[in-house]
From Swiss-Prot:
This is Cytidylate kinase. Belongs to the cytidylate kinase family. Type 2 subfamily. GO terms for biological process: pyrimidine nucleotide metabolic process. It holds the Pfam family Cytidylate_kin2. InterPro entries: Cyt_kin_arch, Cytidylate_kinase_dom, P-loop_NTPase. It comes from Methanococcoides burtonii (strain DSM 6242 / NBRC 107633 / OCM 468 / ACE-M). It is found in: Cytoplasm. Its main location: cytoplasm.
Length: 175
């Protein structure tokens, strides 16, 4: 069974996804890791790479293809990324959300820099991604109607959220 975990930067999707992957002994594929890797390969920041991706649809296509190839080669898999739930056909789809300030603080704690710098980068990145998703895939990233579960990660820590999701996953017979 395929499980998708989506959310905006700093919402906790990667952390929760890794905890679930470990618990269920399944692989996790992260679009963020692919995107960060491609930015690093090109020697640019995430914000710069996001702007580049706005004018170069092949970047999104490459990310989608890498995830799709891996997803199609495994029966049990967690797919983590902002578009994972929008693109997966048969999956248990989860969206993890948190207020912007909470997410930026997490990004600062994880990656360093100042709050103001990370706030600006995050706002720019999210605007860039929303534009790309709309133009390339006709997807409104703010439309959460495709998700089976929406959880606010500012209310609970990653372990409580993981336990909540395990109950939903087990009840659905996903893994």
């Amino acid at each position: 069974m395929l499980l998708t975990i989506s959310g905006l930067p700093g919402s906790g999707t990667t952390t929760v996804g890794k905890l679930l992957a470990e618990h269920y002994s399944v692989d996790i594929i992260s679009a963020g890791d692919v995107f960060r890797g491609l930015a690093k390969e090109r020697g640019v920041t995430l914000a710069e790479f996001g702007r580049l991706a706005e004018s170069d649809p092949s970047i999104d296509v490459e990310i989608d293809k890498r995830q799709s190839d891996i997803a199609n080669s495994s029966d049990n898999l967690i797919l983590e990324g902002r578009l994972a739930g929008q693109m997966a056909k048969k999956a248990l789809k989860i969206w993890i959300k948190a207020p912007l300030e909470v997410r930026v603080k997490r990004i600062v704690d994880r990656e360093g820099s100042s709050f103001d710098v990370r706030m600006q980068e995050t706002v720019e990145r999210e605007a860039s991604e929303a534009l790309r998703y709309k133009e390339i895939h006709s997807i409104d990233i703010h439309d959460l109607s495709v998700y089976d579960l929406v959880i606010d990660s500012s209310r609970w820590d990653q372990f409580v959220i993981t336990d909540m999701l395990k109950k939903a996953i087990d009840a659905s017979g996903s893994f």
